[in-house]
């Protein structure tokens, strides 16, 4: 998919200029962003605060962030706040069937059976919880200092410690296994959520690839993608089929003048668009970066002035959130 301009219809919703393509467009260039539905909102919050994660839940989007913020976001970009008396920063949120679990700093875990009323449950840790993933009705969370949390219902948790050098910053799962990553370039994998193998990417690929600081991992049924930065601050994106052999993707693209350039901006979030068979990165400086199956067809698009932190794709909608609790909505 790309944002290929076909025919545009302009209209106003709630004071926001929105653009809708008459057909289903494709993601190709920054200039063509307006071929998709686009709306952006900001809050009055400070520059350092914002949303940290977002999911699709019950026909709407649910985002979490600093100060315990939990907001529903509609496909038009309007938000509705969920009451939450706990002000810990929430780093991640996940749902399974009707239940919703949000987690974050100092080991906080909030549980909801309906997405409206959230109750604090005992996590058994005071470490920052950074990511969660469901598989086979088992919920696994990753936290600082090698802490793994495990739950069958989202309310009762047990923990174990992994001998890793870094903090577990992200976890994802498919039908086969969980994979997590640390901010020291380590990759952890488990088939049952209890027993984990640990690999040090930086050590194994020393001399072949630059050392990496990992940020997010995303699993689909046949691909695994890790995003982060190299030690020199340049962006890094790794692909694997089974998690055993990793290939770094070249992040080159053609700018609006047709000049070949390389992405220099840090990626923070990732989603998969199955209809377009593309991974889309949410990056600093309001940039989206598309990684289609064609490795020479990457696309750079700037949609905001804010650093983007999280992104999710649901049907025709791409919702991106970031600093200052900004919301960007794109309709393909």
Question: How should each PLM-predicted stretch be described?
Answer:
Residues 23-332:
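Residue-level hotspots at or immediately adjacent to binding/recognition sites across diverse folds
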Residues 1-30:
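Classical Sec-dependent N-terminal signal peptides that target proteins to the secretory pathway
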């Amino acid at each position: 998919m790309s944002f290929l301009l076909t025919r545009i219809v302009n209209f106003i919703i709630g004071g926001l200029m929105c653009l809708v393509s008459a057909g289903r467009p494709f993601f190709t260039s920054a200039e063509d962003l307006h071929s998709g539905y686009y709306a952006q909102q900001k809050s009055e919050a400070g520059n350092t605060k914002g949303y940290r994660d977002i999911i699709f839940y019950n026909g709407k989007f649910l985002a979490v962030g600093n100060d315990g913020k939990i907001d529903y976001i509609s496909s038009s970009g309007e938000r509705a706040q969920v009451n939450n008396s706990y002000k810990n920063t929430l780093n991640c949120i996940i749902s399974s069937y009707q239940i919703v679990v949000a987690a974050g700093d100092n080991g906080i875990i909030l549980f909801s059976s309906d997405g409206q009323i959230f109750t604090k449950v005992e996590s058994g840790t005071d470490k920052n919880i950074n990511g969660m993933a469901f598989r086979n009705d088992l919920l696994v969370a990753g936290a600082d200092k090698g802490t793994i949390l495990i739950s069958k219902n989202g309310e009762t948790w047990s923990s174990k410690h992994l001998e890793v050098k870094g903090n577990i910053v992200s976890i994802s799962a498919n039908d086969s296994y969980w994979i997590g990553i640390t901010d020291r370039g380590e990759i952890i994998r488990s088939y049952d959520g209890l027993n984990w193998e640990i690999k040090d990417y930086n050590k194994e690929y020393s001399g072949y690839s630059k050392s990496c600081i990992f940020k997010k991992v995303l699993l689909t049924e046949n691909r695994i993608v890790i995003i982060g930065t190299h030690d020199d601050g340049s962006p890094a994106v790794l692909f694997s089929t089974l998690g055993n052999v990793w290939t770094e993707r070249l992040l080159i693209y053609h700018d609006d003048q047709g000049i070949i350039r390389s992405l220099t901006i840090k990626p923070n979030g990732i989603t998969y668009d199955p209809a377009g068979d593309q991974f889309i990165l949410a990056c600093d400086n309001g940039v989206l970066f598309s990684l289609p199956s064609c490795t020479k067809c990457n696309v750079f698009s700037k949609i905001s002035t804010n650093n983007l932190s999280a992104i999710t794709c649901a049907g025709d909608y791409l919702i991106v959130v970031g600093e200052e609790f900004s919301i960007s909505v794109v309709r393909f």
